[in-house]
Structures are given as structure tokens and as C-alpha cells.
Amino acid sequence: MTTIVAPPIKSITSIDNDDNVDGVIEKSVKKPVSLTFDQIIDRFYKHILTWDASDLSPKEKELKPVKVSFNNEEDYITTYEPLLFEECRAQLERSIEEGEKDDTSEPTLSRVRYISEVNDFLVVGLVMAENVNIFQFHDNDLIMISLHHPLIVFGMDEDEEMTDDEDTAPTSAATHVGAPTKSTTTTTTTTTTTTTTTTTATTNIIDDPNKTTEDIKKKKKVIPPSKTPITEQNRTLHLIGTVEHLDNGGIKVKFYVKGIKGDRARQVSLLLRYEIDWWTTKLCNLSTLQREFAALYQCSQSNFMKTLMMRDDDGEDGIVMKIPPLLHDQFSSTYNDSQLNALTSALEGNAITLIQGPPGTGKTHVILGLISVLLHSTIVPKVKSGGNNLGDHLLKDRELSMAEKRDLWNISQPWFNKEFPHIRDNYELIDYDFEERDQKRKRDLWRKLRDTGSVKGGSTKRRILLCAPSNGAVDEIVSRLIRDGLLNADGRKYNPNLVRVGPGSHSDVESVSLDYMVRCRQQLMNSNSAIPSSSASTAAATSGSSRSTQDTSSIRTLVLDEADIVATTLSFSGASLLTKMAGGFDIVIIDEAAQAVETSTLIPIQHGCKKVVLVGDPKQLPATIISPLAIKYKYDQSLFQRLQEKNSPHMLTTQYRMHSLIRAFPSRHFYQDLLLDGPNIPSRATHYHSNPFFGPLVFYDLSWSTETKPGGGSVFNEHECKMAMYLFQLFTKVYPDEDFASRIGIISPYRQQVLALREIFKNYPGISIDTVDGFQGREREIIIFSCVRAPVEEGAGIGFLSDVRRMNVALTRPRSSLLILGNTKALSINKDWNELIQHTQNNQQLIPVTKDQPLEIIIPTFTTRELFTELSEKGQQIVIPKPRTEEEINLQKQKDIEKRKKQHKRQKQKSKENDKKKQLKKRKELNNNDNNNNNKESSNKEVQEITNAEVVKDTEINNTKRARTRR
């Protein structure tokens, strides 16, 4: 089993003080220990499962910034490990705060079926109610079991009610697109069996792309009453665990109680032995983070560790290849110079090659060429000083196939061959020239290996792992591979043996998905169909196919072994299905590499590859990171971005997407003015450009518009929404015979604006409306870009609209026309936006839209060139404020921080006052109850005294009567 060098771990207080717990990472590096893969995974969970879900405060003192280069493996691991845990903490915190997006994640009641201890972990079997869908749980799900409802654990009172408008607000400006969105729930308790109860719920998602704020119906969260009395000691009693797998109608969960501080672990461990109901809540899934963590440790055993550390004394260690002549000739006619240079750069001796693909430069086309080149190029031998011979060096850089090893063995030991005549049987067989001929034979063998990569001629079969951060990016390349195919060594087109692996793939690529291919192979085997004689591997797999069913796992392995290209996401490349493949992969190609954190990029590198090609653009949007602290310490930086500090990427410079007037600013501002127009760009000039209000580039200045925050969340600009609609109506009015809906895309940085635009354009389903982040990688003929930001407060910032990478993505989506809607007064405080506004102003592309008349009256007049010239001249006269300096920005940030601190202080004070009011109310109720009890006691006492007095009086009267009678 592979052993990994790990940094030391210091123990934390637990139930047993003798236990050394994998919890907190020690700052001072001591002698490293060796960890197997299972120990790495245990280390990951021992850290996370000790967390207190009711107090997930960050630990900044454990973090350190990502550097450009690292001293050694320990320096590398101890930098990224705390940052990975911080991001995990932030994801868990967000999941707890906002809830899951669907009602399948609602808390339910469960009971313990069994408990066992395995390798310091507490393994618990939980059984659910019959009406609970246990298939909502998956391997590596993080769950919480608690004595009381999770909302009580997180700080709410049992009698507290909360409506949706209090608890759910639109996604804030700082929220990254793609992150979980806030949801609200309504929970009711229903009895299902004699011992087990569960809950049902309805979830409303304010951030649903098909709904606006007005669509959300107000509901109330009601916390079911607890069966166990709530006390300060048991209010937050809970454990965090991870689901191992489904288990006979329930789930098998792993907990780690030894590392938990305080008395919580002991109390829960005792209560687990009793037949009581536990609230079980699904929090999030840790599969990707677990794979990143394992890859972080395993990378120390990879061929790329020196490259990852980026030490100056490290030389290149990769293999060198050359393109076959016929294939090179074919590429010369179908690829431009920058694309061809990128292809040849991947064949150089660099272990990792960087290819930068700005928008519209044919990045996917280059990836297809890369696959053709890397599958069919021949290996160029390295000549190093001090070596014994050429074969020794080739053997170091390449693993020989079994056939090649057998040929070498036969050459070196021919007497083991049955047909070899023994020398003692015939002395005439003595060959005194054997040594010389043997040397010649070896030289010929290695020459053939050098020229073809195989002793049998032709190229050895190489295997490529093709990855991207998202399913959409993977499916885009796979669909192009299916449609366009590849080129072989002779420059002829062919369809490669391609397999798409992993869940979430698009229906367009189903024909090459692993599950589909396995089903087809099973049907073929079970139908007793004739086996094609050309497929020896299939014949071997179907020997004895008289059985009605086949081993799915074996068929899956067979399909993967036959594949030339395996395509999957970065995360799924760490699944056991691929990590256990025999032989691994020779080459890894990662698309959109600049959109992945470095730890994600490490996952596919585990497969023993000799070469990695990273394709991406660090000038566009980075990976989505939840933790602001992790971003502060550069955890969101991609491996591509860090490596380019030392190694300049090969940039594609010819763009085929944007009209030259649209391309001009992004090229100058983001790409050092290196982008050139392809031969097709003149065709981007269309007939509707005769109306200059339709582009190619127009900035409509709504300097009087204002933004609002419905519910205090995401930003919304009503005036820009109306402007977008009236511009679309103007298109259809001027050109009534044309379908513009399918050619227009409307984008905005803010989700609430997107929701409002979708509501306005709901009768035009052909129009694509999305966030800037959601539109990355896509394009439309016409793009309307709503900037939204127009804060009322003077000096206020423009939020994440100031991110220059988001700005780049927005400006590079259109082919023919880009219409920008924005408030120049608000945007010009930012340096980058100020330059764009100045650019449009200098080129007579800035059109002021006044508020003297309603938009529905002004915009229909935007049809004549004379009016455009008149308005653009007014636009040139607009005084654009200077952007804020760095000092002013920092000062504003400090003011914002102070403002937030004051708001937090006021909220805290208000919360304390509310708590005091609640306490006073409870005290009054208690006093009233006590007074009532005292009054009752006093009244009872008086009644008793009166009764006693009457009894005494009656007794005296009776005694007097008796005495008289005696007389």
C-alpha cells in the first residue's frame, strides 16, 4: 500500500487523555509520519467530525497564505490542509444557515439499530421511518444527529416562529453564483409507527431562476415540541457523522467522539445506548473535499511534485514527443500559428504545459488537436550524460508493454525457447560472431522503439484522462469529439474509443456514457449474439456467456480498459472506479483549469501520468470559494495561475467570436492588446448595424437610475430591466420579420436582477437570461448587459461587479452587438469601469438616456443615425469622475467595516434586550403563577380555619346539650 509523508499532528483534549487525536495541525513541523490511503481518509474525518455545529467559528491563526514556491512536501501540505478545512467549515456553515434546496434534506427522526467501534470510530446503524426516502442519503454525506430539533441546536427557541420574509432574502451581492441558496421550510410532525416519527416539509427557494420575489408564498417555520425537556445542558447535544452507505432500510454512519472537547461526547455516547428518537439532518456532501484532501497527500508520490513546488533548482522531467509528418501537415492547414504553437508546446519536455485560451480563440478546437497529437506522436529519446545506453534512458521514461518485455527477454535468454537447439547437441551451432550481432540486434530494437514507441512498429496505445471542473464543460468537449472525431498518425479522421464517466452528464453524450455502454454490452452478452472475431478482449469477456447475467463490475472494468479517452469531472476522477484502474493514464488534459482550486487539479494527477496539460484563462472567473478567509489567503488561486508566475503560458491570440469594435477594449485591457481578428470577423457586421443604436458597441448611460435591495438581499435595478425590454421591442419593431429572441442573451451579475428580467421576458422563451457567471463559456449574437449597480449612498462601492475577471466574461459573450446598461456615475469610481466608460466616450459609443421622458417614449425614437450622432456628442460632454485611488478604496473599506461592526453591535444589543424582555416576561409569568398559588394556599388556609372554628363551635354546642341532658 502506498505510504504518504504527512505533517505531524498534535493532540487535543478528549475523553481519554492518553488518546492522540488527529484534530489540530501543529504549526511547528516535526519529524513526518507515513500514512496509508486509509489513514489519510481517517485523518480527514477525525478533524471534521469533532466540530461543534452550533459553534463553527473560523480559526484564522492556523492559516497561512499560498506562496508561489514551496520548500518541500511538508511546506506544501501544511499550507493547503488548513485552508481546505477552512473552506469545508464555510460550506458546512452556509449549509446550516441556509438549508438545502429541496425538501429531501428536511430533518427526520431516527433510532439506533446497533453500535460498534472500528478503528477509533463509532459506527452506528440508524433506522428511519417507513415513509422516509433513505435514498436521499449518499456516501460521504455529512449528517447531524441531535437530541432536539436542529433549529434548537442552532439557537432558536421551541416556541419561536419565523416567516419566510424574515428568514429568506435574495442572494447577497457577495454570494458566489453556484453556491447553495437560502431556503425556507415548514415542518410538521406526523406519527408513522409506534416508536418512530418523522417530518414532512415544503421548501421555497427564493433564488429559483424561474421565480421572482413576488412568487414566494409566506409560510411559517414551526419547531415541533421536543419529547425530552430542553435544558441548558442538553440544548446543543449533537454529533456530526458521515454516511458510509445505506444499510438494510437505514443508514450506516461513522462518528468520531474521542476528539470532542467537553462533556458532549460522553453524554451522547451514553444516550445512544437508549431507545430514544434522534433528529437526523443531512448537512452537505464531502466527496469532493475528501478527494481533494487525499490528492493533497498523494501528490507527494507523483512525478510532478518538483513542478508543484516550483523550486528554481528543479529541471524538466517530462517526456518529449514529435508529431508524425502527415499529421503535422494536416494540422498546418486547419490550425492557426498560435494554435499550432500550443500543440507543439505540449510535446516538449515540460511535465506540465500551460495553454491560455482567451474568449473565442478556439480553445475546444485546440483540445481536440491536443488529444490527436498526444495519442499518436512518437517519443523522442533523451540523451543524458553519464548514462549506460539509450535503452536505459528510455526505460526510465517509459513503462514497456508486456509484449515488449517478452521480446527483450527472448533476445537476452533465447535458450528458454523450446525451439532453441542446444549447443551441446551440435557444436556447429557455435556462433563466434554472436556478441557483435546481438549488439546490432539491440541497437535495431532501440532504434525502432525510439522512432515508433513500440518494438512491434506503430505507436503504443496511450490513454488520456480528460477533465474539467463542471459536467457542462466536460460534455461540451465530449460532444465535439463525437461530432468531429480525431485525426490519426496519417492525418485521417477516425472516431476514438471514448467513455464519459460520472453522474450528471447530458443526454447528448449518453451514447458514450459508461452506464449506457455497460448496459449495451450486457444486452449483447445475454442475447447470445455472435461475438465479433475482431475483438479479442470482448471474446475473452464473453467466454462462458451462457449465464443469464454478467458481472457488471467486470464489464465496467473491461469498457474502461478498452478506452483511449476517459472523460469526467475533476472531482469524479478521484472516484475508486478510476483510481483502481490497471495502468492508470499516460496523459491528463484539464479544461477550464483556471476555474479550479489547486487541490481539485491534484485529483486526476494521482493516476501515474507522465504529462499534464492545463488549458484555461486566468483572466476569466476563478473557482467558487465560500470562505472569505480562504480567499484572503489565496486558496481560490488555481494551479494554472500559480505556475504562470514562473512559466509563461502559450496563449492563443486569434479570436473568431467578437466584432472588432467589441474585441478592442478586452484585448487592450485584459490581454496586452495581443488579440487578433480571425478571417471570419468581417462577417460579424450585420444589416441591423445600419441603426447605430443596435451596436456593435453601445453604452447606455442611465445615470439617474437607482438600485434597490428587496428583502435586504441581492441588488435589483428596475430602470435597467425596463430599458432591456424596450430595446428588445425596438429590435422587433424595426425588423418585424426577423426572430431576435433566439439571437439575444441578457446577462447581469446579480441573481435578483436575473429573476426580474426572466419575469419581464417570460413570454419570450427563446431569450437566454442568466448571470454573468452562468453565461461563462457561452455566446450569443446580441448581448444586453445590465450592470445594475447604482447605489444611493455617495462613495459606496459596486460590489463584486468590480471583479475585473467578471467584467471580462461579460464583455466577451457577444458576436455582433454588445449593449451595456449602466450608471456611469456609480461605475466610474472603479478604475476598470472608468476606463471602459472613457473608451466608449472617446469612440462616440456612450449614449446618455435622460429621465425627462418615460423610457417607453424615448427609446422608440432610437432609429436614426442623426439622433445617435446628437446623443453621442452629448455623451462626449459628460464629465466622467476620476476613479478612486487605492487609499480611498481602503478608507472606504475601513468605513464599511466600522459600519458593519456598529450594525452588529446594535443587533447584538437588540438581541440582548429581546432576551431580557423574554426573561422578564417569563419571570412575571412565574411570579403570577406563584402569587396565584399563594393566593390559593391562603384561601385554602382561611377556609380550613373557618371550618375548624365551626367544628370547635359545633363541638362546644353539642357538649353543652349533653350536659343539660344529664342534669
From Swiss-Prot:
Catalytic EC class: hydrolase
Biased composition (Basic residues): 900-909
Subcellular location, record wording: Nucleus
Main localization category: nucleus
Region (Disordered): 161-192, 529-553, 892-967
GO BP: any one term: termination of RNA polymerase II transcription
Any one GO cellular component localisation term in the record: nuclear body
Coiled coil: 890-949
Pfam short name (any one): AAA_12
Cited Gene3D superfamilies: P-loop containing nucleotide triphosphate hydrolases (3.40.50.300)
Residues reported to bind ATP: G357, P358, P359, G360, T361, G362, K363, T364
GO molecular function: ATP binding; helicase activity; hydrolase activity; RNA binding; transcription termination site sequence-specific DNA binding
InterPro entries: DNA2/NAM7-like, DNA2/NAM7-like_C, DNA2/NAM7_AAA_11, P-loop_NTPase, SF1_C_Upf1
Disulfide-bonded cysteines: none
Protein EC: 3.6.4.-
Start-end of Low complexity biased regions: 928-937
This protein's UniProt keywords: ATP-binding, Coiled coil, Helicase, Hydrolase, Nucleotide-binding, Nucleus
Family: Belongs to the DNA2/NAM7 helicase family.
Name of the protein in question: Probable helicase DDB_G0274399
Originating organism: Dictyostelium discoideum
